[in-house]
Amino acid sequence: MSDNESEGPTNQTTEPVDNAWSLKIPAFKPEDNPHGLVEESSFATLFPKYREKYLKEVWPLVEQCLAEHHLKAELDLIEGSMVVKTTRKTWDPYIIIKSRDMIKLMARSVPFEQAKRVLQDDTGCDIIKIGNLVHKKEKFVKRRQRLIGPNGATLKSIELLTDCYVLVQGNTVSALGPYKGLQQVRDIVLDTMNNVHPIYNIKALMIKRELMKDPKLAGEDWSRFLPKFKNKNISKRKQPKNKKPKKEYTPFPPQQPESKIDKQLATGEYFLNKEQKQAKRQQERTAKQAEAAKKQDERRNKDFVPPTEDTPGPSRKRAAEDNKVDVQALKAKLMKANKKKERS
C-alpha cells in the first residue's frame, strides 16, 4: 500500500494474541505482486455544487498524489463527479479502495491535506450517517451542536483522545485516523445522537488512557473505574385530564340497556292510545312553558325589587349626650374624698 511504511521484520505467530491492536500490519511491496492487475477497476462519486471551486483548485495535487500509486484521477465538473481508475502499472490491489475513500472524504468537505492520509496503511476512514438517527429536526440540530461543543472544544478533545480527524458536515460525520480511534469516534457519535452527552465518553477515554500506563491493571476489569451514565430523563406517558375510574371486575356481561319500549312500559305510556299520548305530550309541553315563563318573569321583576335599607343608628347629638360627664357631681365626689383624708 504505502511506500513510506517502515520496513522491519514482523513477528508472525500462530498462538492466541491478547492485544490484536499491538500487531503490526505487514507491508505490501511491488515484489509481492509482480504481474500487476488483470482488469481495470474504477470508482466514481458525486460532489455538491459548493465543492466545485475547491476541487478545481486542488485537483492537480490530487492527480500528482494518486500518480505515485499508479492511479488515474478524473474530475467532471459538468456531471459533478470524481473518478479514480487503476492502470497497467498498479501493483497494489487495495489502493483503489483507499483512493475511493479519499474522493468520498473530499466530497464530504474534508480538505485534501487530511484526505490523502487515508492512502497510508495504518489509516482508515469512516463516514457516519446521523441524519436518520433523530426524527425531530430541532433535536437533531441540538445534538449535533453538542457534538461540536462551544467553539469546537468538544470536537477538539475527541480528536486528541482518538488521534483522528473528525469533521461534522450536514447529515454526516467524517472521521479519519487509526482503526481503533475510528471505533471510538463512531461510539461517541452514535451515543451523542441517542441523547448521551459526549462528556461521559470523553471522561471514559481519559481514564482508560491513564489506566493503560499502569501495568498492574493491564489484566483487570476497568469497569469500576469508568463513569456510569444514568438516564434521568425518563419519558412519562401523558396523563389524561379527566381520568375515568376503573369499574370493578365482574365475570358477568354488562346489563343490557333499556330500550324505548321498556321505558314506555315502565311509565305506562305503552298502553295509551294515540289521542292520549298526544294529550300527555301537550300537557308536558304546557307545564314546561309555564315553568319557563315563571322563571322569565322572575328574571324581569328582579330589577324592580327595592333593596333592603339599613336601620338608622343613634344620632350624633344623642350619642354625645350619653357620653357627657356630670362635672358638678365629680367635683363633689373629689371634695368628699379629700375631707376624709384630712380627718384621718
From Swiss-Prot:
Q: What is this protein called?
A: KRR1 small subunit processome component homolog
Functional summary from the UniProt entry: Required for 40S ribosome biogenesis. Involved in nucleolar processing of pre-18S ribosomal RNA and ribosome assembly. Binds to RNA. Required for female germline development, cell viability during eye development and for survival of dividing cells and epithelial cells during early wing disk development.
Q: Basic residues composition bias: which ranges?
A: 230-246
Where is this chain's protein located in or outside the cell? Nucleus, Nucleolus
Q: Where is each KH domain found?
A: 126-194
Region annotation (Disordered) ranges = 230-326
Q: Where is this chain compositionally biased, Basic and acidic residues type?
A: 272-303
Keyword Nucleotide-binding in record: no
The highest taxon in the source lineage is Eukaryota
Which InterPro entries does the annotation name? KH_dom, KH_dom_type_1_sf, KRR1-like_KH1, KRR1-like_KH1_euk, KRR1-like_KH2, KRR1-like_KH2_euk, rRNA_assembly_KRR1
Annotated family: Belongs to the KRR1 family.
Q: How does it assemble?
A: Monomer. Component of the ribosomal small subunit (SSU) processome.
